[in-house]
Amino acid sequence: MASPSGKGSWTPEAPGFGPRALAPDLVDSVDDAEGLYVAVERCPLCNTTRRRLTCAKCVQSGDFVYFDGRDRERFIDKKERLSQLKNKQEEFQKEVLKAMEGKRLTDQLRWKIMSCKMRIEQLKQTICKGNEEMKKNSEGLLKNKEKNQKLYSRAQRHQEKKEKIQRHNRKLGDLVEKKTSDLREHYDRLACLRRLHILELTSVIFPMDEVKTSGRDPADVSSETDSAMTSSMVSKLAEARRTTYLSGRWVCDDHNGDTSISITGPWISLPNNGDYSAYYNWVEEKKTTQGPDMEHNNPAYTISAALGYATQLVNIVSHILDINLPKKLCNSEFCGENLSKQRLTRAVRKLNANILYLCSSQHVNLDQLQPLHTLRNLMHLVSPHSEHLGRSGPFEVRADLEESMEFVDPGVAGESDVSGDERVSDEETDLGTDWENLPSPRFCDIPSQPVEVSQSQSTQASPPIASSSAGGMISSAAASVTSWFKAYTGHR
């Protein structure tokens, strides 16, 4: 191999052993090439155009060194040494990695231990909180158990109370049913007793009967006296006389002027049609004629006596039935003399209203009632054939029947009284809704025979002595009412 200088022989030194002699063939090749200088040929090793060259064989085998003598170590030796160093580096790296792997594992274990400690601490705190909550829940559970036990005991007591109340309610229901049955029977007995008293009252003291009259129709009389009136006018007057306004309509009344209703005897009666013109005429004649009235059969006396008896009967019946009348009417309202037309009409209207009120309370068939027929309505009320006579309980008055009362002699409403003492307003005698219904006193039986009515007293009155008989009957009726009242207060 040629040396880097190109002249003379050069023996490289092996690393660690000093200079080393060149091989004989390498020396020969170098000697042979000493005189060759190629200007354009480049060195395959350093890629320069220096004149000193190295052969390809030496380059391929790595058998060359620096030509300037800086390092005597061949390339192949360096390569081997580099390989050895790399191997040592790899061994050192493996040892370092092995040593670091233990450290890494130690750090990982330390980190895991620290994480586990933190987690254990958190778990301890969680367990502590859980224990506290469990303790609280246990205390709450105990309280709830005690509360539930109390509620259960209370529910048991309430159940016992409920069963006791149910038994009590059943007993009360049976008692109420029994009391209701007893009350119904009591009402039935009371109705029978009231019915008995009313029938005794109407059969003994205030008997009523229908009396046929033989008088002619005033329309016929007027037709005979007034020749100017035609037959058609007479027939119209007769037809108008036989009609009555009832329940919002005009109805025909066949018994308008043919009959009259008597009370306490056939000599005391009222016209069936409610015509009190005889009383009005007598009052007018009384004003013009001075002196005592010698006519005992005067219709005015019989009308006033019949209305007075009817008033007494209505008041007694309302007392027996325990019903407050809507209109306050005294028994002596018709006993005075010279009653004006307006005052008499107002009193009759109140009497009719009271009678209709009593009829409604006893469920009398309203189709049989007419506002002008005072005694006939009263007969329907106290009739023995009335099924509900003596009943107790609520009732309702028909509005059309009340409205029909307003048409009773409407012309009288516009008239004014001459005397100031006769101006009696309806408010003074009205028993409307302003009156408070006080509870009735303790029920007591009215004696069935409170007054002994002798046959002589019932036969003393005679038709020729009408005025004295009327006064005697009024006094006897008043005495009977007084005796009933004394017997009633005596039982209290």
From Swiss-Prot:
It comes from Rattus norvegicus (Rat). Its main location: cytoplasm. Keywords: Autophagy, Coiled coil, Cytoplasm, Endoplasmic reticulum, Membrane, Phosphoprotein, Ubl conjugation. Residues 424-433 have a biased composition (Acidic residues). The coiled-coil domain is required for BECN1- and PIK3C3-binding and for autophagy. Belongs to the ATG14 family. Forms homooligomers; homo-oligomerization is essential for the roles in membrane tethering and enhancement of SNARE-mediated fusion. Component of the PI3K (PI3KC3/PI3K-III/class III phosphatidylinositol 3-kinase) complex I (PI3KC3-C1) in which the core composed of the catalytic subunit PIK3C3, the regulatory subunit PIK3R4 and BECN1 is associated with ATG14. PI3KC3-C1 displays a V-shaped architecture with PIK3R4 serving as a bridge between PIK3C3 and the ATG14:BECN1 subcomplex. PI3KC3-C1 can associate with further regulatory subunits. Interacts with PIK3CB. GO terms for biological process: autophagosome assembly; autophagosome maturation; autophagosome membrane docking; autophagy; cellular response to glucose starvation; cellular response to starvation; defense response to virus; early endosome to late endosome transport. It is found in: Cytoplasm; Endoplasmic reticulum membrane; Preautophagosomal structure membrane. This is Beclin 1-associated autophagy-related key regulator. Residues 222-232 have a biased composition (Polar residues). Residues 213-232, 411-473 are annotated as: Disordered. One of its GO terms (molecular function) is protein-membrane adaptor activity. Required for both basal and inducible autophagy. Determines the localization of the autophagy-specific PI3-kinase complex. Plays a role in autophagosome formation and MAP1LC3/LC3 conjugation to phosphatidylethanolamine. Promotes BECN1 translocation from the trans-Golgi network to autophagosomes. Enhances PIK3C3 activity in a BECN1-dependent manner. Essential for the autophagy-dependent phosphorylation of BECN1. Stimulates the phosphorylation of BECN1, but suppresses the phosphorylation PIK3C3 by AMPK. GO terms for cellular component: autophagosome; axoneme; endoplasmic reticulum membrane; extrinsic component of omegasome membrane; extrinsic component of phagophore assembly site membrane; mitochondria-associated endoplasmic reticulum membrane contact site; phagocytic vesicle; phagophore assembly site. Ubiquitinated via 'Lys-6', 'Lys-11' and 'Lys-63'-linked polyubiquitin chains on multiple lysines by MARCHF7, leading to ATG14 aggregation and loss of interaction with STX17. It comes from the Eukaryota. It is a peripheral membrane protein. The gene is Atg14. The keyword Coiled coil applies.
